[in-house]
C-alpha cells in the first residue's frame, strides 16, 4: 500500500478516501498480526526477526500517512468540508430514527473505535441478523481525547459543543453544561431522548 500512497496524497479528501477505501486494511492486518504473534511467536525464536521487520514496515507506512495527514490538516482545517463530523452525527442520523413510531434504535458510543474495527463489528452484527446495521464514516472532534470525543456524539453537539480550558485541561461543554463524566453525558442522552 505504501507504493500507492503517493497516488492518494494530493489532498485531505484523497487521503481520507484512500483510507476508507483500502488503506484501513493495513490497520486490520497489523491488528490481526499482533494478535496472532502474541499467541504463536516465541519472542527469541526464528520468527522474531520477521515479526520485527513487519512491525517496522507498518510503522514506516503509519508515519508517512500521519505526516501527510498533518500537513493537509494544517492547510485544510478540520473537520473536512462536505463530510459528516461526529458532532453532527446524532442530530443527522440518530434523531430522525428515534422520531419514527415503533422504531427501535441501538446507539453504540464506543471510545477510540477505529474505522477498521467498526468494519469488523459491522460484519459480526450483520452475521448475527442485524441487517440494519449501517456504516457511515464520521470524523472525530479535535482534540481526540475521550471527554471531547464522547461529548461530540451527544444530541446538539454540532451546534452547542464548546471546549473550555479548566485547570490546564480541555473540558467539553454543551452550551453551559460542562461534561466531564460518563454520568453527565448519559444525563444529556436521557434528557434529550426520553419518549414523549
Predicted features and spans:
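…; additionally, a secondary subgroup of soluble metalloenzymes is captured
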Residues: 1-105, 112-196
Amino acid at each position: 500500500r505504501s507504493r500507492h500512497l503517493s497516488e492518494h496524497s494530493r489532498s485531505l479528501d484523497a487521503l481520507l478516501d484512500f483510507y476508507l477505501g483500502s488503506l484501513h486494511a493495513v490497520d486490520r492486518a497489523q491488528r490481526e498480526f499482533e494478535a496472532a504473534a502474541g499467541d504463536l511467536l516465541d519472542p527469541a525464536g526464528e520468527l522474531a526477526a520477521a515479526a520485527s521487520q513487519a512491525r517496522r514496515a507498518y510503522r514506516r507506512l503509519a508515519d508517512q500517512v500521519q505526516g501527510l495527514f498533518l500537513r493537509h490538516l494544517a492547510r485544510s482545517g478540520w473537520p473536512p468540508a462536505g463530510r459528516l463530523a461526529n458532532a453532527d452525527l446524532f442530530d443527522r442520523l440518530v434523531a430522525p430514527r428515534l422520531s419514527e413510531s415503533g422504531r427501535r434504535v441501538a446507539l453504540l458510543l464506543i471510545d477510540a473505535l477505529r474505522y477498521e474495527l467498526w468494519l469488523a463489528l459491522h460484519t459480526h452484527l450483520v452475521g448475527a441478523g442485524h441487517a440494519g446495521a449501517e456504516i457511515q464514516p464520521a470524523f472525530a472532534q479535535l482534540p481526540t481525547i475521550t471527554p471531547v470525543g464522547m461529548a461530540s456524539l451527544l444530541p446538539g453537539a454540532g451546534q452547542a459543543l464548546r471546549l473550555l480550558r479548566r485547570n490546564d485541561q480541555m473540558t467539553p461543554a454543551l452550551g453551559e453544561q460542562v461534561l466531564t463524566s460518563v454520568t453527565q453525558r448519559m444525563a444529556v442522552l436521557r434528557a434529550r431522548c426520553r419518549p414523549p
